[in-house]
């Protein structure tokens, strides 16, 4: 399984000065490099913007479980016209 493969790793990248947080995959699958962004979160004002959510259960759900209200979370990976139809903040 990917998360326990010693050749592939997940890395957390934090840019506190720019309020960006990324979880990336890095490694090798045979002779092909694996490199991609699983999660990209940015803090903008008082909202948490999720630009990329590649987790199976969703990082938004984990943030809600941690006590962050849905009104403070924007699903930025959805187009603006779709966001009002989610349970989360629009912008």
Spans of model-derived segments:
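Terminal domain-initiation and capping elements
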Residues: 1-91
């Amino acid at each position: 399984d990917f998360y326990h493969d010693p050749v592939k790793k997940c890395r957390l990248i934090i840019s506190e000065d720019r309020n960006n947080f990324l979880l990336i995959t890095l490694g090798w699958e045979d002779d092909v490099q694996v490199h991609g962004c699983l999660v990209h979160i940015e803090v903008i004002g008082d909202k948490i913007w999720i630009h990329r959510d590649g987790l199976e259960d969703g990082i938004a759900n984990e943030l809600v479980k941690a006590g962050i209200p849905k009104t403070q979370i924007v699903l930025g990976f959805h187009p603006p016209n779709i966001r009002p139809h989610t349970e989360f903040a629009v912008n």
